[in-house]
């Protein structure tokens, strides 16, 4: 059967650039270097369309011991089709380095992306930082310290790591003594030195949207509520969405209605 159809373009195509090196860390007895990489997904440019799109920087979790920048990217296609670029960022883990190098890496990635905004077709003044679990902790910490230089190392220091909105999913907030994964990983001392990120909360914090499941048996709902309450008390803008019955890293977090709520927050808060 032969058909001729007329197709109405309702959403953009999506393209992916993987293996982008944004920095490096010393390795093997400080005698060699290992690359720090990100993957960048964005709407495919079309004739007459705006080229510089807003950016979501995404951080996956992994108990501070492992990270995979691409593992959640299939779920992020939804946002790319709504007109956003998404950068999945690898960061240092505690098996290789000491904290706060993971936060330093993420802030370096943000500055790198700002420095290369024209090249990648992104708007360096419209950046959202979003992450889950351990990545949610780093998301909140980096979002709260964007206006100071505490963790700014590695290059591109003529740019700041400031972002315009912060969206941590089921984040760790007060870490001291917590087990990340039952019977397997306990937070090392160098992380617990930064045990309570509410100490970084100020009135000038960027807008926050916190997502947490009421049934989270790994990172209790009280952790997300602690961050929300701290932001509210400081006079900063904060929203919180509690997913009834949702566990840690639950599939509920990637359902269309939840993504739509995230998008609504982003569209209201980006300049």
Segment roles from a protein language model:
Residues 1-50:
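N-terminal cap/lid segment of alpha/beta-hydrolase-fold proteins
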Residues 7-12, 25, 163-200, 206:
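Mobile cap/lid helix-loop segments that gate and shape the active-site cleft of serine hydrolases
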Residues 50-62:
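Short beta-strand element of the alpha/beta-hydrolase
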Residues 59-61, 113, 212:
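The conserved beta1-alpha1 loop
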Residues 69-88:
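Short amphipathic alpha-helix adjacent to the substrate-entry channel of hydrolases
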Residues 108-180:
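Primarily recognizes the serine-hydrolase "nucleophile elbow" in alpha/beta-hydrolase
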Residues 221, 225-271:
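C-terminal catalytic histidine-bearing segment of alpha/beta-hydrolase fold enzymes
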